[in-house]
UniProtKB/Swiss-Prot annotation:
Protein name in the entry: Palmitoyltransferase ZDHHC2
GO molecular function ontology, one term from the record: protein-cysteine S-myristoyltransferase activity
Motif (Non-canonical dileucine endocytic signal): 334-335
DHHC domain mapped to chain residues: 126-176
Lumenal side: 37-47, 191-207
Gene that produces this protein: Zdhhc2
Annotated PANTHER family: PALMITOYLTRANSFERASE ZDHHC16
Protein species of origin: Rattus norvegicus
Higher taxonomy: Eukaryota, Metazoa, Chordata, Craniata, Vertebrata
Length: 366
């Protein structure tokens, strides 16, 4: 086998280094289990009832923490479906034509039947030069993964993965259960921390573990509470981290609340319709990740929606099994709770995204 070049060696080294934060969290979690379950509950606690209650509650939180963390790490980010990729002939035309009207016409023809409503800051179709595809709404190119990610929120080094449509719910639950895990440890460890601090308990091997465990749990509780609170706010507004920093641009212009459907509908966009799955790291988000219902406050173009009959979710996001195309819907200027989304055969058909498109240019977003 031919030796790999310097570029291949660097890529492999980077891939190894990217796992360091995950290994750190895993080692810290393993030590916290030993410190709490063994040194605190079994060695230091004298009351049997207290031991049983603390161990049962701790193992429940520990299991949910590990489950959600695992799902966040190993759920593959979803990429745009084939319909957003340019055909071989279209790619050849783009390579032959200069960056002029002929070049733009190729993109115009490719995008006219796609359910896309967001644009670049200049009003052009969002196109990725590296992936050679037209970006779906809320899709962005990750420079670390070097691919376009559906509804990308951010690339998280602590999970060594892109957080997007396929695993955003898992990421939220990971934050929630890790926060509860740290708060529970800090609360139940506090009295023993004070007793060791005031020399109320003899110096033993457990002293270091119990005291350091409290400091670590309290420190992580503070940082996790702010991060979890921020993402709860994002969910309530139906925004991603990228959209919070840069408002999405639609055909009519910038609209910071363009995807907000109201608190209840925003929650269901992420957690799904069946509340029994909300607290479990099981995929239940609405939609297919390629098109999203919008609430346009400045203009009233036709928008894709998810009617009741098509409200099925992609049960296996890793396999890219998307539900049927959403029907089009003419929405009012403000989407209210009194609106009902019903399937109407007279309204069905493809949304013609290219009817009022401005001149198209290329976008290279990393």
């Amino acid at each position: 086998m031919a030796p790999s070049g310097p570029g291949g060696v660097r890529r492999r080294c980077r891939r190894v280094l990217y796992w360091i934060p995950v290994v750190f969290i895993s080692l810290l979690l393993g030590w916290s289990y030993y410190a709490y379950a063994i040194q605190l509950c079994i060695v230091s606690m004298e009351n049997i009832g207290e031991q049983v209650v603390c161990l049962m509650a701790y193992h429940l939180l520990f299991a949910m923490f590990v489950w959600s963390y695992w799902k966040t790490i190993f759920t593959l980010p979803m990429n745009p479906s084939k319909e957003f990729h340019l055909s071989y002939a279209e790619k050849e035309l783009l390579e032959r034509e200069p960056r002029g009207e002929a070049h733009q016409e190729v993109l115009r023809r490719a995008a006219k039947d796609l359910p896309i409503y967001t644009r670049t800051m200049s009003g052009a179709i969002r196109y990725c030069d590296r992936c050679r595809l037209i970006k779906p709404d809320r899709c962005h190119h990750c420079s670390v993964c070097d691919k376009c990610i559906l509804k990308m929120d951010h690339h998280c080094p602590w999970v060594n993965n892109c957080v997007g449509f396929s695993n955003y719910k898992f990421f939220l639950l990971f934050l929630a259960y890790s926060l509860l895990y740290c708060l529970f440890i800090a609360a139940t460890d506090l009295q023993y921390f004070i007793r060791f601090w005031t020399n109320g308990l003899p110096d033993t091997q457990a002293k270091f573990h119990i005291m350091f465990l409290f400091f670590a749990a309290a420190m992580f509780s503070v940082s996790l509470s702010s991060l979890f609170g921020y993402h709860c706010w994002l969910v309530s507004k139906n925004k991603s981290t990228l959209e919070a920093f840069r408002n999405p641009v639609f055909r009519h212009g910038t609209d910071k609340n363009g995807f907000s459907l109201g608190f209840s509908k925003n929650m269901r966009q992420v957690f799904g319709d069946e509340k029994k799955y909300w607290l479990l790291p099981i995929f239940s988000s609405q939609g297919d990740g390629c098109s999203f219902p919008t609430c346009l406050v400045n203009q009233d173009p036709e928008q894709p929606s998810t009617p009741a009959g098509l409200n099925s979710t992609a049960k296996n996001p890793e396999n890219h099994q998307f539900p049927a195309k959403p029907l089009r819907e003419s929405q009012s200027h403000l989407l209210t709770d009194s609106q009902t989304w019903t399937e109407n055969s007279s309204n069905s058909g493809r949304c013609k995204a290219g009817m009022s498109n401005p001149a198209l240019t290329m976008e290279n977003e990393t």
